[in-house]
């Protein structure tokens, strides 16, 4: 069934434009409230948000929807996405909501939904919500005496800080470690510096003054240049780059070099395998993860299971097949021993634990394999289905033939933006670049002609 509202990570779009309007947000609250409320019992939703200005608008619309459906609402304020998932369980809520567009610019926003177990909702429930939104909502409203209440709660941010701190082994301290944290002017701007400082690190914080429109603006995990310069400038041991909702993380070593999610997963996989903590005989990643990671794991008799892009698909595969480590090259790292979704802070703490335990610099700990030359480019489209175009199909087939068995080609539409992502990797860098550029040119040409 075709989706109209939900993408790979909830509902997302430009604020005040379809589908990210107050009207639709209110209907989402009504539909979700009706599905998850417990008949004859008090039911509860928790709502968190990042630091986008439009978060206030969508928060109020969701509150109207949930309370109209008979649910009480706890408002958590600016807080990381993984904290919402954790607090959904901790506060015995029936549904958790995060208002965020993750790493996107401030003018975008989104709605992510978590069930009472802290996991993202299934495709079936999302389709049920869509069907309800498009119909008459009147039958789903609560009676006069059952309308819900809403209140803003204080202090729950500290529950999450304590939870994150407990994931660092008690025998390991961060004393003497100089850490620069790039908070992306987002949801992690309070929790990440506080947790690291309480664990003993010397913390230098950048991009921790959100104003509603500077989230992810030339900062955070998608723009780590400022962090690289800061780490080098203050001679820090490590830099930690979060994204707008703090569910992904990249590191910067003491030399100012970026360490991506593939390298971070390699560190955790090797460490946990050595201590018999790794489950499933390997890890789960997406089709975008580097071939070098797969070879690294194979050399250690560990497997790499690949899924479609999107941390929800990684988590689904982990749950179905018994893995406890998974993630994406972009920095979504899912450690199911601790969390139900990607968690930037907790993932960073696991890497710091390995470095402290081995008494080695981050550059030594996190350079586990030589990545195969890989190139990812995006091409913006103007609608239609360019991947079904004959010329585009022909270009893709030709590219696969040229790469042969020495590389991989992944082409997919973005689930959150009007983009086609083209990625190729292989041992021949020149060939990889040629293949990607040729496909980009054809898609651009055909998309323009169809506009």
From Swiss-Prot:
Keywords: Isomerase, Magnesium, Metal-binding, Phosphoprotein
SUPFAM superfamilies: Phosphoglucomutase, C-terminal domain (SSF55957), Phosphoglucomutase, first 3 domains (SSF53738)
PTM (free text): Activated by phosphorylation.
GO cellular component: cytosol
Segments passing through the bilayer: none
GO biological process per UniProt: carbohydrate metabolic process; peptidoglycan biosynthetic process; UDP-N-acetylglucosamine biosynthetic process
Modified residues (Phosphoserine): 102
Signal peptide as annotated in the record: none
Coiled-coil spans in chain: none
EC number(s) given by UniProt: 5.4.2.10
Positions of disulphide bridges: none
Cofactor(s) required, per the database record: Mg(2+)
Cofactor note: Binds 1 Mg(2+) ion per subunit.
GO MF terms held by the record: magnesium ion binding; phosphoglucosamine mutase activity; phosphomannomutase activity
Sequence positions that bind Mg(2+): 102, 243, 245, 247
Cited Gene3D superfamilies: Alpha-D-Glucose-1,6-Bisphosphate, subunit A, domain 3, Alpha-D-phosphohexomutase, C-terminal domain
The reaction(s) this protein catalyses: alpha-D-glucosamine 1-phosphate = D-glucosamine 6-phosphate
Active-site residues, record numbering mapped to chain: 102
Family: Belongs to the phosphohexose mutase family.
Database matches in HAMAP family: GlmM_B
Protein task: Catalyzes the conversion of glucosamine-6-phosphate to glucosamine-1-phosphate.
Protein's name in the database: Phosphoglucosamine mutase
Organism: Brucella melitensis biotype 1 (strain ATCC 23456 / CCUG 17765 / NCTC 10094 / 16M)
Top-level taxonomy: Bacteria, Pseudomonadati, Pseudomonadota, Alphaproteobacteria, Hyphomicrobiales
Gene name of the encoded protein: glmM
């Amino acid at each position: 069934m075709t989706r109209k509202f939900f993408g790979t990570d909830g509902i997302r779009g430009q604020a005040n434009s379809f589908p990210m309007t107050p009207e639709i947000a209110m209907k989402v609250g009504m539909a979700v409230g009706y599905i998850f409320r417990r008949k004859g019992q008090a039911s509860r939703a928790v709502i968190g948000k990042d630091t986008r200005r439009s978060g206030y608008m969508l928060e109020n619309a969701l509150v109207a929807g949930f309370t109209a459906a008979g649910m009480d609402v706890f408002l958590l304020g600016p807080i990381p996405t993984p904290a919402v998932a954790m607090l959904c369980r901790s506060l015995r809520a029936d549904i958790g909501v995060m208002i965020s567009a993750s790493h996107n610019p401030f003018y975008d926003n989104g709605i992510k939904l978590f069930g009472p177990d802290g996991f993202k909702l299934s495709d079936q429930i999302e389709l049920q919500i869509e069907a309800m939104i498009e119909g008459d909502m009147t039958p789903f409203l609560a009676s006069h005496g059952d309308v819900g209440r809403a209140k803003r709660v204080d202090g729950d941010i500290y529950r999450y800080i304590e939870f994150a701190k407990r994931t660092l082994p008690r025998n390991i301290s961060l004393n003497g470690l100089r850490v620069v944290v790039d908070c992306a002017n987002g949801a992690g701007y309070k929790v990440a510096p506080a947790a690291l400082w309480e664990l003993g690190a010397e913390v230098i914080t950048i991009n921790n003054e959100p104003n509603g429109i500077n989230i992810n603006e030339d900062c955070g995990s998608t723009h780590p240049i400022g962090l690289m310069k800061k780490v080098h400038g203050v001679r820090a041991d490590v830099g930690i780059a979060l994204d707008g909702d703090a569910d992904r993380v990249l590191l910067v070593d003491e030399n100012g070099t970026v360490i991506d999610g593939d390298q971070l997963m390699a560190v955790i996989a090797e460490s946990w395998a050595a201590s018999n903590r790794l489950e499933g005989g390997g890890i789960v990643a997406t089709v975008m993860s580097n071939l070098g990671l797969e070879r690294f794991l194979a050399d250690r008799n560990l497997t790499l299971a690949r899924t479609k892009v999107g941390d929800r698909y990684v988590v689904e595969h982990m749950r179905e097949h018994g893995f406890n480590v998974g993630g994406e090259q972009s920095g979504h790292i899912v450690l199911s021993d601790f969390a139900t979704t990607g968690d930037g802070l907790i993932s960073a703490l696991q890497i710091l634990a390995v470095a402290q335990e081995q008494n080695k610099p981050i550059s030594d700990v996190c350079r586990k394999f030589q990545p195969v030359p890989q190139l990812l480019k995006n091409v913006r489209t103007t609608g239609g289905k360019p991947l079904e175009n004959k010329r585009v199909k022909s270009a893709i087939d030709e590219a696969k033939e040229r790469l042969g068995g020495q590389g991989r080609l992944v082409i997919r539409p973005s689930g959150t933006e009007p983009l086609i992502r083209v990625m190729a990797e292989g041992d021949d860098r020149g060939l990889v670049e040629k293949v990607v550029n040729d496909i980009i040119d054809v898609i651009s040409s055909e998309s323009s002609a169809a506009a």
